[in-house]
């Protein structure tokens, strides 16, 4: 029963990736429907912070007045230093 989990809560991932200073703020952004999730070509708005995200999912959201688009590369196990957090995602071009 070992191995990395294949999914993570959206708010927890956003916090671990250091896009938001607190997990409460990340949860609020998700609850307000301000995060879009693209999985297997289907786009949806997150309405719950507990919604699962997986490696390969794409997220679009606003941070500090800027639109941010990322592809999830890893789920992470903790909120680590910024260098570790940058390894959790790859930036995408916003079209």
Each model region followed by its residue ranges:
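Strongly charged
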Residues: 2-12, 16, 27-28, 36-95
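Glycine-centered, phosphate/nucleic-acid-interacting loop/turn motifs that mediate DNA/RNA or nucleotide
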Residues: 33
């Amino acid at each position: 029963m070992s191995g990395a989990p294949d999914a993570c809560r959206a708010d927890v991932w956003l916090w671990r990736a250091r896009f938001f200073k607190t997990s409460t703020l990340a949860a609020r952004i998700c609850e307000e429907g301000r995060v879009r999730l693209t999985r297997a070509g289907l786009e949806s708005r997150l309405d719950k912070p507990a919604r699962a995200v997986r490696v390969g999912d794409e997220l679009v959201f606003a941070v500090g007045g800027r639109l941010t688009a990322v592809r999830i590369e890893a789920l992470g196990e903790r909120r680590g230093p910024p260098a570790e957090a940058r390894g959790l995602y790859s930036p995408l071009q916003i079209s």
